[in-house]
Amino acid sequence: DASEAIALNPYIYILYDLRAISRIRQEDYAGAIADYNKAIAISPDTRNYWFNRAICMLNSKDYDDALAQTDSIIRKWQRFANAYQLKAEVWLNKKDTVEAAKWLDKSLEIDPYDASTWTIRANMSLARKQWADADKELGKAIHLKPKETGNYVNRALARLNINNLRGAMADYDMAIDLEPNNFLAHYNRGLLRVQLGDDNRAIDDFDYVIKMEPQNFMAIFNRGTLKEKTGNLRGPIHDYPKVIEQFPNLWTALSYRA
């Protein structure tokens, strides 16, 4: 293995990289950092070793070391957009969204075609409830990488909050096309269909959620309410007791069952 090869020839830097990757898989970040230290000492201009070492520092929550490392990378490779993005991620872990936004913007100035950076930027906008910004940023991420299911689900949330219901529905549909078992997309689409008065198709979505998560009592409650609304009284008589058993003080379910 890599350790045996290193013992035979300790000056082949790629062996340290291979062992570091193995250690990362085992979440031995300290060991991986030690290997990258040796690899960098032998090959100081291999950018990925610097970058991977910084990621290990982030994963081991050595945030100050990770910031210092990203600073070193940026000094050596000023046009390396991923280093700016990584620096932003460190600031996010330090709960400083202002600094994080600044470094994400710098990353996007260098490489405006990186979908993951747009996704991180959009997630920050969602957290701040800047819905219109999140909609635009997720649009860019989706344009660049159109098969990321989570981006459609998140953009649907942004669009709901700017009253673009048609756009939100299209995003939920696309998320489910890409990932048919995504129960969150099914659940949220069910809620949106209720809002749009499409009760029968909403029931279909809640049926799917309950099939995937039999103990999802909110989906059970919503399905019972909709079945009652559509005239199927046997449905709520079946669904409401399950909810009441779990939440005996939920007066809404008690009154609806009555």
Which residues does each predicted region cover?
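Alpha-helical tetratricopeptide repeat
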Residues: 1-258
